[in-house]
Amino acid sequence: DKYEAIPHIPRYADKDGYKPLIFTNQICKLRKDKHGWYVKFPKAVLQAGWVRDRYDLGKMDLHEQKLKEVRLIPNGDTIKLEIVCEIEIMEPTITIHEATRVAGIDIGVDNLTAIAFTSGHRPVLIKGNEIKAVNQFYNKQIAHYRSLLRTGKKDSKGIHQTKRMKRISEKRNRRVKDILHKASRKIIDLCVEEGIEVIVVGNNAGWKKRIHMGKKNNQTFVQIPFRTLIEMIKYKGEAAGIRVVVCEEAIQSKASSIDEDQIPVYGNDVTHTFTGKRIKRGLYRSKNGILINADINGASNIIRKVYPCMPKRERWSRGTVNVPVTCI
């Protein structure tokens, strides 16, 4: 409950602490040589000893980008360089309610995302194995070093985190963010290829605080930053001219999308009767015996949340019940 309380007024900043340093495009420039793109700072800044003369940007393609500002952000024992560029966003040509080509995304753990399309494309699963492996290895490392650090000490005595543990945490965070960037980019590329007009993503506010799946499963679920993934899908979709709608998803995986069962509302204690059921992990059977991937069934129900009046023949093509394509 303390995490949902009204936040306190911030204290004064530490005069000896680290703060973000922001350079406008009047101070620093983007340049390119045979080694690729890099950030160039003026001599006055270099003489002050704040930064190096250049920061290489690797394989970033910045031909169409207009630099707005460069930020140096304190991040633990390191400094993070952020480049803010202005890009042109494609304006959607239709409204949300006019769309007929829609993609529904169900976010989970074993399958990071399950994507159903109304365009006839086979549904797609993006597996969550990689991000689970990263978190499991991270937990194992942190538990090992914490046991060495805290053995024989009371909770109020001594330090609780070393520099090595901080580096391990920062590396884990970078790897998870990289996985989410690649997954969200794959989703948007698929939607652009299929001419998708609207993406509907399921999300429940506060679901991590109220989850009860056992200690081990809770840890796996809570350690995946689902909200970060949703925000990545939103801004990348908007840049591609695709509208992104985030809706409450409730326990939509229990309702049969093929039989058009009523979808429950999250937090509502009303008892519902469903015509189909999940017969094993990852497999759902409808009233008429049609088998469908359970997560794809959930993704299809997410579309129904926003488009309940869409004609059934447009909403459920044969592609919905096909074996989904697995990628990443």
Would you name each region that the model predicts?
Residues 1-328:
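Nucleic-acid substrate recognition interfaces
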